[in-house]
């Protein structure tokens, strides 16, 4: 097949040919599902997208600080920050998309502190009727290799019990205590995972 394409396409379309074969190769890659959040998961995904396009990222949604925390309170949506980082990491046009999606508005603006990518995802979720549909639409726009899936659509909060018995709630508040952590959990503790997250885990190689 490759020799036929090389004969048909002019020389200046060689990059297109390489892209076609790269997509075919990645499409035959293993089905991998990774679970996490923060910068660690997005860093892992940047490398994985060159191995397979059958990659699912199940992302935690307990962030309550910064732009994500504000949107969570004001719009009643799950925090988009970690979801955004994973979308950017898996985007086929990563350098350009990263500059746009990671842009943060400066002080002096009504949007100061907000991240453009967070606002974009929030807008897509509202336009498409749900966060999952909004993420799917955003993935198409960014030409994402794989899927980014929220672990739950419930309003969850991270909580921690310190070694001195202190209980602290909120991901952004826990580090401020400067105390040793005995155990961590979520509130409420019986939230339901998204069906797409469960499906991705069950179908992974």
Annotate the PLM regions.
Residues 1-31, 39, 43, 52-57, ...:
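Conserved catalytic alpha/beta core of Sir2/sirtuin-type deacylases, generalized to analogous enzyme cores
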Residues 34-36, 115:
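Short glycine/serine/threonine-biased micro-segments
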Residues 35, 49-50, 57-62:
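Gly/serine-rich nucleotide phosphate-binding loop at the start of the catalytic core
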Residues 36-37, 79:
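Short coil/turn residues that cap or connect secondary-structure elements
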Residues 40-44, 65-68:
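Short N-terminal binding/cap micro-motifs at the start of the first secondary-structure element
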Residues 47-54, 74-78:
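A glycine- and small-aliphatic-rich helix-loop capping segment at beta-alpha/alpha-beta transitions
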Residues 59-132, 137-142, 147:
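Glycine-rich nucleotide/cofactor/substrate-binding loop typically near the N-terminus or early
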């Amino acid at each position: 097949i490759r020799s036929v394409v090389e004969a048909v396409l002019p020389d200046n379309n060689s990059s297109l040919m390489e892209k076609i074969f790269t997509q075919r190769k990645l499409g035959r890659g293993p089905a991998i599902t990774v679970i996490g959040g923060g910068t660690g998961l997005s860093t892992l995904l940047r490398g994985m997208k060159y191995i397979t396009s059958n990659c699912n990222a199940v992302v935690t949604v307990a962030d309550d600080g910064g732009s994500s925390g504000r949107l969570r309170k004001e719009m009643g949506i799950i925090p988009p920050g970690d979801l955004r980082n994973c979308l950017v990491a898996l985007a086929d046009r990563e350098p350009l998309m990263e500059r746009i999606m990671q842009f943060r508005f400066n002080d002096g603006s009504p949007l100061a502190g907000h991240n453009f990518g967070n606002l974009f995802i929030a807008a897509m979720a509202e336009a498409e009727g749900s966060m999952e549909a909004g993420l799917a639409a955003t993935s198409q726009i960014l030409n994402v290799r794989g899927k980014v899936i929220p672990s739950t659509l419930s309003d969850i909060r991270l909580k921690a019990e310190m070694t001195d018995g202190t209980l602290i709630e909120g991901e952004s508040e826990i580090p401020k205590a400067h105390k040793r952590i005995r155990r961590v959990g979520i509130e409420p503790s019986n939230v339901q995972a998204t069906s797409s997250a469960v499906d991705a885990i069950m179908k992974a190689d």
